[in-house]
Amino acid sequence: MSKTEENFFEYLNFFEKSNINNRAFFIDKCNTFYSDDFVLKYAYNLDKNFFPFRDDLFSFKDSAFLLNENIKAYISNMSFLHKEFQSNNLLGNFSFSFFENDIIFMLPEIFLSFCILFSICFFVILGNSKKFKFPFLSYSCGLFFFYSFFLTFFLIFNSLNLDTFCFFFHFNNNFFTNLVKLFLIFSSFFCILFSLDYMKKDNLEIFEFFFIFSLSILGMFFLISSFSFVSFYLAIELQSLSLYILASLKKNSNFSTEAGLKYFILGSLASCILLFGISLIYGFSGIIFFDDLAHLNIVLFNFVEYSFFNGLILGLLLLSVGLFFKIGAAPFHVWIPDVYEGVPLLVTAIFAIIPKIVIINFILLFFSSFFSSFFFFWHKWFIFLSFFSFIVGTFGALYQIKIKRLLAYSAISHVGFLCLGLSLNTVEGFQSVFFYILIYVLLSILFFTIIFCLKRYNNNTRIYNILDLQNLFKVNPFFSLIFCLTLFSIAGIPPLMGFFSKFFIFLASIKESFYFISLFSLFLSVVSSFYYIRLIKLIFFEKNSSWIFLTPFSKNFSLILIFLTFLNLFFFFISCFFFRNSL
């Protein structure tokens, strides 16, 4: 190896160990000597170890990378740049501290991890203490995590506008990721309230539920902040393993055990497919960081053979299959109806609300920011998923008689709208997706609050069959009216909250001339209104020989119903008020 090459690799190895500010300074210094934009991008890519064959770079004389004269000039003059840095003693000004920034910027995750570890030690020891007569701790544990989430919410809110990389560029916290975390914690508050009331009324003492649920939330925090395939896979597996345990929460129930086993087997298969896709992307590019992959797609698009991009596309396809399995997009939906029906109602609420927040926003961030140059591929792939999800979700729900299976197919149909918005690759499309998932989660919380309230007074059993809703209006008119408004909103009837989420998706797709899929989704949205209207017909107009008397609602559920119903009814006026004040 020549002296020039030795200086080049010495300089390169140094900057691989430096932080992001040093990298920016390095690019700025290159700009002083070289004006060619491609050379600068190549230098930026190379200094972050883009290629697995970096050490053999100079042996590829016939490669398209080295045929470029600008790159040859860059390599030949690297020694001059290296001497310039040495003469000005610029290398000695750089420092890197692992704990200086990482703990501060990852404080919400670290705090939540500490709360989980502390609660496991404290509640397990106290719950098995003979001195305290083996106390029941589920309610106390639930309150502990409720306040822990409350403090975590303010820790995230305090760092909302920060934009930084943590743990050697494996995590990235910015405004978008922190906003998703805030919404995730907000939804978790309702799940904790659901669990406290559910365990109290059903006489359950499963305080382990709160540990596992908090672990899944922690995994979702890491998932939305992940900036490399390593952190991404570890985070999504932490979330998935926690959800596998939650699916089998009722150990004495055969339905819960069967649902947990189905979810575990199919979820493990999806994780294998996802890992295989990651390995293909890494094998063809040698890249684990997302921003490196984005730069590679942009900078080297015209300098590699088609087999390289075919490998990336195959890896991207397998990775998206694993992700869309997690949210239940058709045709990867086969686990949703059986799992939703078999798991306890509390776990069904978690499956329907929590994972979709993080995974949909991660897909939005990943494909729009790092794989935007592959729009020609994932645009068609998302349209196919949207088309298939509309069909399966709409027609699969028409003949369902159980509420949880009806909800499962309805969730598949909603994923179709999200895929339609993701396929647009426009700012309006991505904004409509984020707004849709926001409204979907709020309506899901409202719907599950209603389902939790449907409990018979005489035998203390829950209502899971839609035929049992007959004559409900005669028993509780106000509650039936709230139920009716919620169903209309989910169906997309104006001027309720659910209408605007679908309206913005349609508006963004028509703006991009997606006329056929827009009309098709609009038609199936009208068809899907049938099974919501059927529920309303049973509640208001069907006569039943027996009367359904419900148990009194808890104070927490009553407040949730009032608040979310008010938001559902007056969402248009509230949004107009805030928009006018922001101008």
Model-derived segments and spans:
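Alpha-helical transmembrane segments of multi-pass membrane proteins predominantly involved
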Residues: 2-17, 23, 31, 41-42, ...
